Amino acid sequence: MIHQSMTSNLSFYISSVSHLSSPLPSLSRLSLRCCSSLPAHDMETKPSQGLYPLHRCKTIHLVRHAQGIHNVEGEKNHKAYLSEDLFDAHLTPLGWQQVDNLHKHVNASGISNRIELVVVSPLLRTLQTAVGTFGGEGYKDGVNTPLLMTAGAGNSDRPAISRLNRPPFIAVESCREHLVCLLFYLLHDWHFLEMKTFAMFLVQGVHPCDRRSNITKYRELFPAIDFSLIETDEDVLWKPDIREEDKDIATRGVKFFNWLSTRKEKEIAVVTHSGFLYQTLNSFGNDCDPSVKNEISKKFVNCELRSFVLVDKCMSSSDPPMTNYPGTILTGEDASSDIADQK
């Protein structure tokens, strides 16, 4: 269902979750920039662009984590996702190469100099991707600056990473990966599930690779990342027998975007997961041309970055316009020409 907060003949921005029975109450606040889906004969009379005040817009750079060990093992055999050996999966050597390439890209394109905040999901693979991509070039002896990552953190052979001249990093639970039920594997490959393991189906419902480590451990490995928004040291959100439904992921994602819109920063990087991105971004683009909808919501590959404009269409943003100029209200005889023009 498409939200009708704008006039019916405008379709610049998205405010619905297509697979839900009714619109999310909070979704109408936000939009991702896209084109109109107007018929060709209407293009000359109806605008195909969106026009919003600049101070109500943010640029967000969405990044999926680089290749993790769970990605490799899962490609070989889907059953591997159920292995405790993949608990809080770390990056592979190829994953770190992907991070190095993305690091070069954000520096060469100027993105790294514009970003004011890096938001990251508190799992090892996303933390490693975030600091490797948006962190400093490396720690140097004698430079008194906090470390984004200690040397060798997370079974890596990487040197320490400095936060020198880098933006703040903050970990947020609400952009974590979704929980996946074993039913997926039951449908994907029925024969692997023997009757003796059927009882496990009732209690073992999600991937251990999506369960995070304690925050105490993360603070030791990533000293300069702010974990203050995470309320519990242990992972109380991951459940061994509960599957988060797609619509719930979308709702969580929309709430996360709402939170982004309240931040003072105007350009933000978010390092997160493919499932979270797919379900959240699928909430947008339903009144766009199909090619634009696909550009918004298609699945991310490892270490992919896409940039969007996030628009707050309500009055939730309190930031004043920084580039507007009020002009001068004329009085007396000088006002006559303006008054005449308004009649």
Swiss-Prot record:
It is found in: Plastid, Chloroplast. The record marks H273 as: Transition state stabilizer. One of its GO terms (cellular component) is chloroplast. Residues 1-35 form a transit peptide. Pfam families: His_Phos_1. Signal peptide: none annotated. Gene3D superfamilies: Phosphoglycerate mutase-like. Transmembrane segments: none annotated. The keyword Signal does not apply. The active site is at H65 (tele-phosphohistidine intermediate), E177 (proton donor/acceptor). Residues 322-343 are annotated as: Disordered. The keyword Transit peptide applies. Keywords: Chloroplast, Plastid, Transit peptide. May play a role in carbohydrates metabolism. Belongs to the phosphoglycerate mutase family. This is Phosphoglycerate mutase-like protein 2. It comes from Arabidopsis thaliana.
